């Protein structure tokens, strides 16, 4: 019986740490950082193997063309940003072949991962899980915002090559760096549009949350990240 009229699940309580800046900097988490890529490759390969039959009571969206879906959301905001439009043009022109349709977490990144001192313990925040291209999760890990100031291209910890090789071994999928970079740029644009959307919600008083207002101010950060990423691609 639902206590609030909505579906919910009860999960086991697991002790650990989620704060990204601690994971990236504190010596307590040295081993967790060392194991991060292999742990993530195993976790994502397992997530991407899940099938619709595993969720008989959940209506999960299938996103076969996420770029078009994101552009529709952006257009509906009616708040033009030239950097975002440049990114949309580049993404359309350089779109890679689809990897396939898999179960996708949708927000796999530091901050949504629970660590013990020796590695990954749990993956949190499943509310935007859906079926789509598994590369979406890999690219999202690489978005500059989710590096939290770390030096590595992947979550501030590691590099593209190590991630792709570890994921290949665990999943059997071979993904090129060019494809991963496309999904990273898509993820950066997606986060920028989300920030734009949240800022609009605050300005139009659909919400008065200061947290939402603060996220809305991060549009400029994402524009800067997009310009850096596009310059690396020769734009």
Model-assigned labels for residue ranges:
Residues 136-173, 186-205:
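Active-site activation/catalytic loop segments of kinase-like enzymes and analogous catalytic loops
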Residues 213-235:
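Regulatory N- and C-terminal appendages and interdomain linkers associated
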Residues 58, 174-186:
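All-alpha amphipathic helical-bundle segments outside canonical DNA-binding/catalytic cores
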Residues 18, 55, 113, 131-133, ...:
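Conserved protein kinase catalytic core
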Residues 32-36, 100, 159, 176-179:
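Conserved acidic
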Residues 47, 89-142:
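Active-site acidic catalytic loop and adjacent metal/ATP-binding pocket
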Residues 36-40, 66, 80-83, 107, ...:
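An acidic site on a long C-lobe helix of protein kinase domains
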């Amino acid at each position: 019986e639902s206590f609030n009229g909505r579906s919910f699940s009860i999960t086991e309580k697991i002790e650990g740490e989620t704060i990204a800046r601690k994971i990236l900097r504190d010596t307590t988490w040295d081993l967790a950082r060392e194991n991060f890529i292999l742990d993530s490759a195993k976790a994502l390969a397992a997530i991407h193997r899940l099938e619709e039959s595993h969720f008989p009571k959940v209506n999960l969206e299938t996103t076969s063309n996420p770029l078009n879906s994101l552009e529709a959301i952006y257009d509906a905001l009616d708040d033009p940003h030239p950097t975002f439009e440049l990114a949309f043009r580049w993404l359309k022109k350089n779109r890679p072949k689809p990897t396939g349709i898999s179960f996708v977490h949708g927000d796999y990144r530091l901050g949504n991962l629970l660590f013990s001192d020796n590695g990954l313990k749990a993956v949190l925040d499943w509310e935007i899980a859906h079926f789509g291209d598994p590369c979406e999760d890999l690219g999202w890990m690489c978005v500059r915002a989710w590096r939290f100031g770390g030096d590595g291209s992947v979550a501030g910890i590691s590099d593209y090559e190590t991630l792709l090789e570890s994921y290949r071994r665990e999943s059997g999928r071979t993904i090129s760096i060019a494809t991963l970079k496309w999904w990273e740029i898509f993820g950066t644009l997606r986060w920028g549009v989300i920030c734009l959307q949240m800022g609009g919600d605050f300005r139009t008083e659909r919400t008065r949350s200061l947290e939402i207002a603060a996220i809305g101010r991060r549009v400029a950060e994402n524009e800067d990240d997009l310009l850096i990423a596009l310059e690396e691609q020769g734009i």
